[in-house]
């Protein structure tokens, strides 16, 4: 299986790539930070393409470097700063936080899917792995809700080609690539990768347009 993994310059993206590689698949890593990306690609012995997935120009220029035929796209958006309670920040800070969250979380996924979605073979899959945020959160919570709704809508679009598209939302306490990286237990990150991998298998053919949560039930506090 040919797999494209974005966010390859983050620990979470690297973990996703490692999970697919260990399962015997051919992986291409994508990331904006050349140094971190090249280190990850060398350690995993996979191909790498330097590209900022929030930038249409960068994606257009890199398009010819991506595999011509893909079975799976794994989107790992970069972390974004959430201003939280707007009363504690200036209007400018809040605006920047929302724009940053939109670019990092939604546009990076939307633009990547638009750029290479036609490279997917029939029966392929798209999985986006993002941080889980509580309903009462700030910019990140609202933006990730927007992404989930977009994913749900795209299920109908890609379903005509037998392609599934889903989101894995992982709690901050159990993910890598966002915060407390060195303190996050590696087996937990690997569990997230295994869920992403499962969503690309024939056993998950009827799961599409969904957001699956891996958070030790954290959202139960907001139910």
From Swiss-Prot:
Record GO biological process: fatty acid elongation
GO cellular component: plasma membrane
Any one GO molecular-function label of the UniProt entry: oxidoreductase activity, acting on the CH-OH group of donors, NAD or NADP as acceptor
Record has Iron as a keyword: no
Organism superkingdom: Bacteria
Keyword match Oxidoreductase: yes
Binding site for substrate: 128
Transmembrane feature ranges: none
E.C. number(s) listed in UniProt: 1.-.-.-
Residues given in the record as NADP(+) binding sites: 4-28
Keywords from the UniProt entry: Oxidoreductase
NCBIfam families recorded: PRK05884.1
Similarity remark: Belongs to the short-chain dehydrogenases/reductases (SDR) family.
Miscellaneous information on this protein: Was identified as a high-confidence drug target.
Protein name (record): Putative oxidoreductase Rv1856c
Native source organism of the sequence: Mycobacterium tuberculosis (strain ATCC 25618 / H37Rv)
